[in-house]
Amino acid sequence: MPTREWNWSHAEKQTARRAFDRALDEEKEAAIRELKERVARIRSAEDIDDLWALEDWLRRRRKGIDDKFDYRYSVLPEVFARLLFEGAIEEADLSGLAREKVDEIRRIAGIYRDLASRRG
């Protein structure tokens, strides 16, 4: 859910796109590495259940990536907060965004940290 409507300058859009694309590329590369590892464990037709499990994993992984990486400007602060919390981006990746946007991203990332610490 968007926290508020932001106006994004051309320079901010470029900064946001670079940070977003870099994190997305890293996520896709990690998924491909894991896929190759899982495929390598399937040795024969006797492992057919592993093949169907791979299909299920791939479907869930794609949904997870699609859900996490939403490039609508209305939700980018939440997206960046999650990526910051997960370590997929650093605050330096956001330099070029207006201070109030970075502050909002930090605030939301703090909420993620608080929730994670409560879960243990």
Where would I find each of the regions flagged by the language model?
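Acidic, Ser/Pro/Thr-rich low-complexity regulatory regions
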Residues: 1-120
